[in-house]
Amino acid sequence: AFGTSPDFDANGIPDECQGIVKYCTCPAPLGPCGNNDPNAGCINSTGVGALFTPSGSSSVAADDLVLTGSQLPLNKIGVMLSGNMSVGPLPFGDGLRCAGGLVARWPAKFTGATGTVTYGPGLSAYSAATWPPAKQLLPGTIWHFQFWFRDPPGPCSNGFNLTDAVVVFFGP
């Protein structure tokens, strides 16, 4: 994309035209300790990087957005972060942080026996019932999502890591 429109996935299409975009992978040389994964977050103790995959839409009225974390260490706790700005990518623990600005922390979840977590549907309704307007998922707002998780045996020995990120341009 040219001009002032963001293009986080570098595909030449302005992100606001796509609604939902994945970004913040961990290509070389960005991994904090060489734990690079160009297709996901930085490598964790499973041997691969964790993914945060969107499904559904960016429509607040439909409220059908689902964000699924996968390739996560088994039976570990984590939280989804949403921020109104993109930062970095910044080295953070064994991974990269890309969700920043005004940050909201969603309810903690365990990765369970499958190494997965799911948030949604109903994210817009939850945000409206829980947070002040500045942190709500409203039409016309842009939010960046990542899942932060504990990973004590992780490759860099920092004890935690993050998935790649998803940016959502919320519409009516």
Language-model regions, residue ranges each:
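Glycine-aliphatic tripeptides that mark coil-to-beta-strand junctions in extracellular
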Residues: 1, 8-16
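A residue-level detector for conformationally permissive "hinge/kink" positions
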Residues: 3-4, 132
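Amphipathic alpha-helical interaction elements
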Residues: 5-6, 147
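Extracellular, cysteine-rich, disulfide-stabilized repeat modules with beta-strand cores
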Residues: 6-8, 26-27
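Residue-level hotspots within well-ordered secondary structure
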Residues: 18-172
